[in-house]
Structures are given as C-alpha cells and as structure tokens.
From Swiss-Prot:
The keyword Transferase does not apply. Its main location: cytoplasm. This is Probable inactive serine protease 37. Keywords: Cytoplasmic vesicle, Disulfide bond, Fertilization, Secreted, Signal. Plays a role in male fertility. May have a role in sperm migration or binding to zona-intact eggs. Involved in the activation of the proacrosin/acrosin system. Residues 1-19 form the signal peptide. Residues 20-233 form the Peptidase S1 domain. It is found in: Cytoplasmic vesicle, Secretory vesicle, Acrosome; Secreted. One of its GO terms (cellular component) is extracellular space. Pfam families: Trypsin. It is linked to Patients with unexplained male infertility (UMI) show a decrease in the number of sperm cells compared to fertile men. Sperm exhibit also abnormal activation of the proacrosin/acrosin system and premature proteolysis of ADAM2. It comes from Homo sapiens (Human).
Length: 235
C-alpha cells in the first residue's frame, strides 16, 4: 500500500518534486531485507556480513543485493539466505536504544559495481558535517510491494545538544541526528530510512521508533564498532 507523506513527517524516504525525473543513485552497499512483513534496509559491511536495525528481524528473511528492478536484469542480482542473526545484546522491542543486528550470509556476496561493502566509521562525526543519506524507494513504474530504486540525499549532522532538545532526540541514547533542510512530496511506498554515510564511512543506521518532525534519528554506528568487529570476525 502506498501513502502520501512529507519528508518532515517520515524521514529517510527519498522523492522528488518532479516525480517524472527519477534516477538510480549510487549506493552499492545497500541491501534489501525481504520478508512477508514491512520492508527493511541493511548495509553490506563485509562480503559475508550485513549490518541492519534489530527491529528488522523478521520471519522468512532473505537478503537481496545488486539490482533490485524486477523487470530489468543486469547480472548483479543476488538473493542470499542468512545462516546467523545476532542482535545487540541490550536491544529491546520496547525502546529505541541499541537497535542493531548483524546478519551472516550463507555464502559471501559476489562483489560487482552494484554490490560493495561499506567501511565502518572510525571516529565520531563533527556537528555540521554534511553527510549522505541512502535509502530505497519505489520507481514510478513499480506497483509492487518491494522497493527497487536507490536514492541519496544530503543533510547536516546536528550536535548532541541540539538533538537532545528535539522531541525525537531526547529519548535516544547513542544516537546521531541529522537536520532535513528540504521538503518535497510525491506518492511513495513507505520504506526504512537506511543509512548515514560521512566521508565514505558508515556513521549511522536507522532506528525503529521514528517520531516525525524535521530531524532524523539514527543509531551512531561508531559507538558499536567494537561489538560489530568482534561479532563479525571471519573465521
């Protein structure tokens, strides 16, 4: 089902004032977590590992990589089953904190121009830094249930103090906040907000309890790098 929203109401869905102009943005690290429930987006961080929000732990999960367009095949398409899913130890469905999980793929993804891992952040990002937000949307000709179009936009990172003053940010720990400065609208399918990439490194990933407004709240990946690296060790 598709709805009309505004960027200030639901962050992370990507659309244009002129819906006749659509293009595929480069975001080869994005993977689509396909299930019988709501769509979710993850990030390939190693050929065998995907980082995703823990609330995306869904039945019959399949990981889709490469080209997502069902009517156009280009040889980059891959669908891989998970063999292990590890949620962050402190995650709870009742709170927005620690909303991370790692997915180990049954076999390594085959890397190509549309399938590439993304490096994890090594430092906290400075407030005011303009970062890239990546997500998935529905192309104009797609009337199906699953998104098929990678989309990017830019937004500045807020300071922790600014974030804590907002309705969305005050209840989040280990968060990263961005300020949306443009509002466009068109009909689109609801999809997860996905990622924040700063200086070509994964800095933030969506949380599951978005509250609306013009501020996007993300889990600060840098705060969890030790857990991610220890869990996703290639044996």
């Amino acid at each position: 089902m598709k709805y009309v929203f505004y960027l200030g109401v639901l962050a992370g869905t990507f659309f244009f004032a002129d819906s006749s102009v659509q293009k595929e943005d480069p975001a080869p690290y994005l993977v689509y977590l396909k299930s019988h429930f709501n769509p979710c987006v993850g990030v390939l961080i190693k050929p065998s590992w995907v980082l995703a929000p823990a609330h995306c732990y869904l039945p019959n999960l399949k990981v889709m990589l490469g080209n997502f367009k069902s009517r156009v095949r280009d040889g980059t398409e891959q669908t891989i089953n998970p063999i292990q899913i590890v949620r962050y130890w402190n995650y709870s469905h009742s709170a927005p904190q620690d909303d991370l999980m790692l997915i180990k793929l049954a076999k390594p993804a085959m890397l190509n121009p549309k399938v590439q891992p993304l490096t994890l952040a090594t430092t906290n990002v400075r407030p005011g830094t303009v970062c890239l937000l990546s997500g998935l949307d529905w192309s104009q000709e797609n009337s199906g249930r699953h998104p098929d179009l990678r989309q990017n936009l830019e937004a500045p990172v807020m300071s922790d103090r600014e974030c804590q003053k907002t309705e969305q940010g005050k209840s989040h720990r280990n968060s990263l906040c961005v300020k949306f400065v443009k509002v466009f609208s068109r009909i689109f399918g609801e999809v997860a907000v996905a990622t924040v990439i700063c200086k070509d490194k994964l800095q933030g990933i969506e949380v599951g309890h978005f509250m609306g407004g013009d501020v996007g709240i993300y889990t600060n990946v840098y705060k969890y790098v030790s857990w991610i690296e220890n869990t996703a060790k290639d044996k």
